Amino acid sequence: MGKINVAIIGAGNCASSLVQGLHKYSEIDEGSQRIPGLMHNVLGGYTLSDVNIVAAFDVDAEKVGKDLSEALVSKNNNAIQFFDVPNMGVKVDRGMTHDGIGEYLEDLVEVNHDPSTPGGQTADVVGILRDRE
């Protein structure tokens, strides 16, 4: 079987827990003991090691341009750290803010809107997804 390529939209707390879990339990297979929180060790013939994060997008200036492993532990994230995620080689690209950001985040997240500076220009999301499929 092949890999399941995944793009992360928003490198926040949920993404942090997901990526930590993918790394911590990457050796789990059909014969492994059941892990609390993981409903199935194998699903449709795929294991967690088959999930490959190929792209990540965010609008937070603290995260854009960093490796995903670094962005997931930025100051605005407060998910419990249960696994030290190694450098993934996945740069967080600037996502879209055409409809703004949520009211609960607008006072916490600094968004760079200056397209002439690094991280201020919205990335070519479609192009990135096509290139990394």
Model-derived regions, located:
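N-terminal glycine-/serine-/threonine-rich beta1-alpha1-beta2 phosphate-ribose binding loop
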Residues: 1-133
